[in-house]
Amino acid sequence: NKLILGCSSTIIPQDIETIGEFAFSHCRNLQKIIVPEGVSCIAGGAFEYCSSLKDVVLPTTLESFIGGSNFGYCTSLESITIPKGVCNMESDIFCGCISLQKISVDSANETFDSRNNCNAVIDTEQNKLVAGCKGTVVVDGIKSISSRAFYKSGITSVHIPSSVELIEPTAFKDCEYCMSITVEENNRTYKSAGSNSVVEKATNELVLACTTTKIFPEVK
């Protein structure tokens, strides 16, 4: 059973298993959604552009976010909890959620975690930051950051710890509020040196910049 279209007054029936693509997209008056037990999948763009959405309750039966931008541009959303059964999501699940400050993952989840209150979704096995937000701290132990993990987020400052070995292209794409970027001095892959940027040491390639960036003369 798949819900294909909803509105701000919809109460999702108990027998629904999937929230379809763009089912609630552009429901600008939707402020709260309770996804009932039994739902296992939320498809791409399901709640995209629900600009008033502040309160999201997800079921323990949820397993997958597919298609990306599931909560894209929910500009009023400030916090969300990922249930224990979720084992699949795209990195741009929260793209454009400029107010999102807190992301927590149920401690019983075997695929993802939000270690040390980092306010991000981490792939536990790969130590990969999958999805972040305005309030994310990239904690030590993270080895890589996914493409589009912070796409159009409200993040204002970024610190790359020594453990990060790979920042995928577009990981911080269109982060227009970001004003400060630093890299741990003993990071083997990247450097910053007070330039408000991330530069790959081996190639001198500018990987990440912001409005306050000073570009090294040696940057290629």
Model-derived segments and spans:
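Consensus positions within tandem repeat domains that build extended binding/scaffold surfaces
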Residues: 20-23, 43-46, 68-70, 91-93, ...
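Structural signature of tandem-repeat unit edges
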Residues: 1-18, 28-41, 50-64, 74-88, ...
